[in-house]
Amino acid sequence: MKKKIAYCIPGLYLLGGMERVLTHKANYLAAKTEEYEIYIILTEGHDKELAYKLSPNIHVIQLDINFDDLYVVSPIKKITGYFKKQRTYKQRLEACLNKIKPHITISLLRREINFINKIKDGSIKIGELHINKNNYRDLNNFRIPKFIQKKIASFWMTQLIRQLKCLKHFIVLSEEDKEKWTELDNISVIHNPLPFYPEQTSNCTNKKVIAAGRYEPQKGFDMLIDCWKIVSEKHPDWTLSIYGEGMREELQKQINSLNLQDSCILERAVNNITDKYLESSIFVLSSRFEGFGMVIIEAMACGVPAVSFACPCGPKDIIRDQEDGLLVENGNIEQLAEKICYLIEHDEVRKQMGKQAKNNVQRFMIENIGPQWENLFQELLTNNPRS
């Protein structure tokens, strides 16, 4: 009998890491047509195209809740509208699950986590988190005092943990993050899978450093630009290209003020990021925090060694320090510059680390990550047979 697996995610129209990873995993399972029947249940993007190619074997169900509509209304309407939409979501998701009767329902810990354990459709409920515990709800963009932020975050976390304890299982992306969830014993780690593994490999000879990610404070590009000022003074013939979308104005002002316009370039996000990795010799991750750090394994798959802050969470699970990349004390700009300069100045070390990176990163290929999910599904179904 086929195993029915249902994923709950807001939408699949955004060019985001969570959306791409889910698409990759779902396509892997859907290809096993004799074993799995895959459903993806959405609340947003009813009139938008999917960002990533999805297997025709996958059933996409649009509940048409559209929480996104609340972004353009007054604060009062936001509050009343949210609770109304949340009630509608629960009703429609409950009806949907009772209709399709999945064996396992997976929440990506968005709005449904508040009620999914109450839905009695017979499916096993599990959750997967694509950010780390400490940054599950990032309130830094809200203009409210820090002490109020902490109280709100503490309340949210208490509520979340109560729901997570009711799940049959909970998946996080790194060993480092797992250690933070001391309240839970129904937890394990499954890393994100590589989205690609090209036959080509960077020869690590071009005088190019690359970084990629959204232009927002989390990614720490402000620190990277300060770091590049140090690097460029020693190696003016090298360039840094940062690929992404978002709030670029302040970053460009910073580049201009440091007179780095010729060597530090803010590029638009591109569809052919693989080609950009292959043209580069060093990858840098300057994030303040991560859920995992997909861009690191992408660069490594192209044979490009990474220099990364040892931020929470992900880089320490991915990079084998001094073997296939270099880890730097989190937030230490001077040390980041020093490590980049080290790879610039040591050609053979750089090339060898690139080769080792391409070899070591194979452990994240879908052929290795996919079976971990399948084993989990089988274990859960064996231990929790449907009555």
Which residues fall in each region the model found?
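N-terminal strand-loop element at the rim of the active site
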Residues: 8-15, 28, 32-79, 180, ...
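Membrane-proximal helix-turn-helix segments that form the acceptor-binding/catalytic region
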Residues: 91-98, 147-169
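Carbohydrate-associated surface elements
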Residues: 176, 193
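Aromatic "clamp/platform" in nucleotide-sugar-dependent glycosyltransferases that forms part
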Residues: 269, 288
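Glycosyltransferase donor-sugar binding loop
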Residues: 40-47, 212, 239-251
